[in-house]
Swiss-Prot record:
Domain SIS intervals: 62-225
Protein's UniProt name: N-acetylmuramic acid 6-phosphate etherase
This protein's encoding gene: murQ
GO biological process: 1,6-anhydro-N-acetyl-beta-muramic acid catabolic process; amino sugar catabolic process; N-acetylmuramic acid catabolic process; peptidoglycan turnover
Catalytic activity: N-acetyl-D-muramate 6-phosphate + H2O = N-acetyl-D-glucosamine 6-phosphate + (R)-lactate
Length: 304
């Protein structure tokens, strides 16, 4: 896109407009300034609320993918890419899943997590190549993230995923974006102009984080990664998480600490298995068989 055409496109984007509520922020005290930011931030959950139907639709597609051996893949550039990588990296310790189940891709690669990479987002072919590098297939779900809704890198990835017949989802902060025209499911969190004109790491980034939280949390809950609201598949990989696993077993079963610790030891720190053993009064092997029969869904295994 030529510089003239790009300027024209940017001038039409809500995320590139000047915010009338922040015109004088360079004259405000610290308290006045953070009040303005806070007031603007209140619009973010309201914008996300308007997209709940689309978010739920995406969750259903992600669940189907997981159940059929597929993955959730995030792709973005800059802040959008970093948020995708962040959300993906939280899934293994929180839900005990493989690091391959939810994948985050950022334009420019690992270095781009900490440093700006000039021009990394400007090439559609690089977006396609990034998916090919992780063997993206029809079984997977692609979530393209870009506040502008026009990032070439993300568009290239969405077009490639769509050509394979995979489910495609876009997350943008401008309505009717180029990404939305490609994606099967368009999540347009229109949060309005930023406090700092064009600084989409702010409200737009916050909206993206809220949506990503919903996508992975709801999907993991629906495939049985929690019991009530407890993280029963948590990986007890450090002292804090080991203590949390004990607490989870105690709360789920109403047992004392000694029972929880002893059962967790037998269950090799698997909180879900320990809970199953205690509540079904069964040994480790029987509890494992019951959970396997019900695809790891603890509540269903206990009921049946």
């Amino acid at each position: 896109m030529s510089e003239k055409n790009l300027l024209t496109a940017l001038s039409k984007m809500i995320t590139e407009q000047r915010n009338p509520n922040s015109m004088n922020i360079d004259q405000l005290s610290a308290l006045e300034l953070v009040k303005v930011i806070n007031q603007e931030d209140k619009q973010v959950p309201l914008a996300v609320e308007k997209c709940l139907a689309q978010i739920a639709q995406a969750v259903e597609k992600i669940v189907q993918a997981f159940q059929n051996g597929g993955r959730l893949v995030y792709i973005g550039a800059g802040t959008s890419g970093r948020l995708g990588v962040l959300d993906a990296s939280e899934c293994p310790p929180t839900y005990g899943v493989s690091s391959e189940m939810v994948v985050g891709i950022i334009a420019g690669g690992e270095r781009a997590l900490r440093h700006p990479i000039e021009g990394a987002e400007d090439n559609t072919e690089q977006g396609k190549a990034a998916l090919q590098a992780v063997n993206f297939s029809q079984k997977d779900v692609l979530v393209g993230i870009a506040a502008s809704g026009r990032t070439p890198y993300v568009i290239g990835a969405l077009e490639y995923a769509k050509s394979l017949g995979a489910t495609t989802v876009s997350i943008a902060s401008n309505p009717n974006s180029a990404m939305a025209q490609i994606a099967e499911i368009a999540i347009d969190t229109v949060v309005g102009p930023e406090i700092l004109t064009g600084s989409s790491r702010m409200k737009s980034g916050t909206a993206q984080k809220l949506v990503l939280n919903m996508l992975t949390t709801a999907s993991m809950v629906m495939i049985g990664k929690c019991y009530s609201n407890l993280m029963v598949d948590v990986q007890a990989s450090n002292e804090k998480l080991k203590a949390r696993a004990i607490k989870i077993v105690m709360e789920a079963t109403e047992c004392d600490r000694t029972v929880a610790e002893n059962t967790l030891k037998i269950a090799e720190n698997n909180a879900k298995l320990a809970i199953m053993m205690i509540l079904s009064d069964s040994d480790k092997t029987t509890a494992e068989q019951l959970l396997s029969k019900h695809h790891g869904k603890l509540r269903q295994a206990l009921v049946n």
